């Protein structure tokens, strides 16, 4: 029998499970305050759904052996979008939904073998609202949710924002295969790849300018307006950042606009963003999201019905980031009910019920102790802070 979990699988201890639940509950309370209803999408879906119309690569999906092509969900947006366009299609828009659950990604390990990456997510989806109104609510909700996580300055939270329309503007002068090569180089911040394309000097310098055109959103928008003139996407972003700037400043979140930023999954057809924090070892993405109208349209929606935005939090990564803070602020008091030779286990169990009726966590020591001192010495091992000693 194998004594280690599969590579990439999560094998959480009780404390980690408890912290995950606390984080999920905090976020769920915020979602409910904003009028979002909980749904529970299936872990197993048809591959056609999981691929999201080609937006998610086959190699990112964990496939199952079955009579029909099935896989484990690498994210929950596609499944929720399908439900919104089928079972929930008669519900009025805006349609506000939230979900929490495990996702599974297939990845290649360092030695070249395939393994499963298992993660807990919590997030929201908003259907039936056009730009930029949906994005205004979505990011406002994001900031409200982040506030409950109580990030500190040492985490250096930064919201990185992009927009597919900005990348389209940059790509306008280029065609076909060259267009895709340039796009890939910009997304990966690969100057060498751009040099190897041997573009005319003016085009190369312009692309380098776009590559370096990132930073404070309003400054970047001013520079982009000078290059591309009046554009609806730029106007929408201007309005969005004017609204989000004060909210971000209140929470110490740095806003950064990057015209070449595009996420790993090609779901998005508008605003895209990710929230990055600094851990002890390296930067970590704790939330990501954006607009995915094309995905909703592929599920059969038409017109304004084919509009969707959403985001998700990476609960496991947030837990690792905040473990020390949560442990220090939310330690739970627990009582150890122990008994000596003059009492019995039955007495201890009855006493335990007394504590439980008061809503107090209580654990029974199942073997009799010689004396109070022995019982007291077992407190730490049992995870308890106080002793209830029975000896008569």
UniProtKB/Swiss-Prot annotation:
SUPFAM superfamilies: Class II aaRS and biotin synthetases. GO terms for biological process: histidyl-tRNA aminoacylation; L-histidine biosynthetic process. Pathway: Amino-acid biosynthesis; L-histidine biosynthesis; L-histidine from 5-phospho-alpha-D-ribose 1-diphosphate: step 1/9. Belongs to the class-II aminoacyl-tRNA synthetase family. HisZ subfamily. One of its GO terms (molecular function) is histidine-tRNA ligase activity. GO terms for cellular component: cytoplasm. This is ATP phosphoribosyltransferase regulatory subunit. This function is generally fulfilled by the C-terminal part of HisG, which is missing in some bacteria such as this one. InterPro entries: aa-tRNA-synth_II, aa-tRNA-synth_II/BPL/LPL, HisRS-like_core, HisRS/HisZ, HisZ. It comes from Prochlorococcus marinus (strain MIT 9303). Required for the first step of histidine biosynthesis. May allow the feedback regulation of ATP phosphoribosyltransferase activity by histidine. It comes from the Bacteria. NCBIfam families: PRK12292.2-1. It is found in: Cytoplasm.
